[in-house]
Regions:
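Helix-turn-helix
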Residues: 9, 17-51, 55
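C-terminal peripheral helix-coil segments that are non-catalytic and often amphipathic
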Residues: 94, 98, 124-154, 159-202
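Short, amphipathic alpha-helical "lid/cap" segments that border enzyme active or binding sites
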Residues: 11, 65, 82-89, 153, ...
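Small/polar-rich, solvent-exposed N-terminal microdomains that initiate assembly or binding
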Residues: 42, 54-82
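N-terminal intrinsically disordered/low-complexity leader segments
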Residues: 1-3
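Amphipathic alpha-helical segments used for helix-helix packing
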Residues: 83, 97-124, 168-172
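Hydrophobic alpha-helical connector segments
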Residues: 69-102, 153
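Generic hydrophobic, amphipathic alpha-helix propensity
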Residues: 6-15, 31, 56-68
């Protein structure tokens, strides 16, 4: 295999194992054995297990955040709160709900494991993007203070991660046969409306 192929194979294998077992419960030896590479390869390409996790998450977050900002920059000056929230949520659902994307599961596992290093890495990646969105929402809802917007943004992100991780399993269990609950476009629209109402309420 070429260097590029070897590196990608390690990333793909780590993604699968982190999603299945969690970061803490996955050893480098498990990753290298499943990827059929030697143990030194992880250090060579990534510098260790933690940096491997960061690159795996960063490879998804960076294009996602770039698309969010592209859509935000395309808004007209009279944009609504819903327009801003749509720019934030739609790309996440489009990218992270793909069948082969285990990132929501990995993030959920890391949250349960209280992985502070990953949380700080994500914060560094997201902070500049979040600042843009907070400013854009504040423009449409000037009566809200920064603390109020941040708290509601926390609830929005929590709702997004729940939807991505559970795939509406609870709603589908309550009402079997509701096919629209399997439609990502429908789910995205409902989440956008739900979060818009949450931000807009006095």
């Amino acid at each position: 295999m070429s260097n590029t192929e070897t590196k990608q194979k390690i990333l793909d294998t780590a993604q699968e194992l982190f999603a299945k077992h969690g970061y803490s419960n996955t050893s480098l030896r498990q990753i290298t054995s499943a990827a059929d590479v030697n143990l030194a390869a992880v250090s060579y390409y990534f510098g260790g297990k933690e940096r491997l996790l960061f690159e795996l998450v960063g490879n998804t977050l960076r294009p996602l955040n770039a698309e969010r900002l592209r859509r935000l920059d395309a808004l007209t000056s009279d944009h609504s709160t819903e327009d801003v929230i749509r720019c934030f949520l739609e790309p996440a659902i489009d990218i992270l709900s793909k069948d082969n994307c285990d990132i929501p599961c990995i993030l959920g596992q890391a949250h349960r494991e209280q992985n502070r290093a990953l949380q700080e890495f994500i914060a560094q990646e997201v902070r500049p993007v979040a600042a843009r969105f907070i400013d854009a929402i504040h423009t449409t809802l000037p009566h809200l203070g920064t603390a109020e917007i941040l708290a509601r943004a926390e609830f929005m992100i929590g709702s997004l991660l729940h939807v991505l991780h559970s795939q509406t399993a609870i709603a589908r269990a309550l009402a079997p046969g509701q096919q629209r609950l399997n439609d990502n476009t429908f789910i995205a629209e409902q989440l956008i409306k739900f979060c818009t109402a949450g931000f807009s309420n006095e």
